[in-house]
Amino acid sequence: MIFLDSATRDRTGETGKNIESKKTINIDHHVSNPEYGDINCVIRYSSSTSEIIYNFIKYMEYKFSISVAEALYLGLVNDTGNFSHSNVKVGTMQMATNLISMGVNNNYIVTNFLNSNSYQTLKMMGEALKNFEFYPEKKLSYYYLDNETMKKYKAKKEDTEGIVEKILSYYEASVSLFLREEADGKIKGSMRSKYEIDVNEIASLFGGGGHYKAAGFSSNLSTNEILEIVLKNI
């Protein structure tokens, strides 16, 4: 079994829990990946798992189909924030150029996958922009979304994507924390940073992880307890 872009075995979901295989291959780029596979290809300086797969296909001299090229391009623009994150390097842009030369339509990918939102997504974003808090002494943007609000708009967790990045866009903020209450009462946390703050290290305090500037975690602590710990460690 091959696991892609899953920082921990828990992130592989029901498939990883319920299906057994003689060997597991772990292909990923997250800094916090503990290399849980029997075979591990964890390249932490890579912009995305898509870039790792792209380089493997090139090395093996396999032919790229247009559907494969499109999937790799989508993964690339998603994990680099449409080439806005610090993980973008020369090789990243060369990969994008090569995929576009194969026939990938950048405008179609960005318009239909990155810039296309549901009613619920826009409502969740509106709630975040209306209610987020800012802690100037730590330059932290913070927002908590309870399950009742999600039920009100019939929103799914996918409809909350982008909130943690949006509240980070406040010009005085250096780091953002987005907490979301799940149906079972657990708190799902997401963190982002602009500059020197290592949010992977902070997320690890709750058993989570990810990247230097983007990380996540789940916790049974209250939102106030989580916020207090985060503020102490920024």
Where are each of the predicted segments found?
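Short, hinge-like loop/turn segments at secondary-structure boundaries
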Residues: 20, 42-45, 194-195
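Hydrophobic helix-and-loop "lid/oligomerization" segment in the mid-to-C-terminal part
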Residues: 78-234
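Short, well-ordered alpha-helical microsegments
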Residues: 10-12, 50, 199
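Residue-level marker of motif borders
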Residues: 23, 74, 202-204
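Solvent-exposed alpha-helices and their adjacent loops that cap or buttress functional pockets
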Residues: 16-19, 33-34, 64-66, 75, ...
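Short alpha-helices
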Residues: 27-95
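Active-site cofactor/cluster-binding pocket
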Residues: 1-39
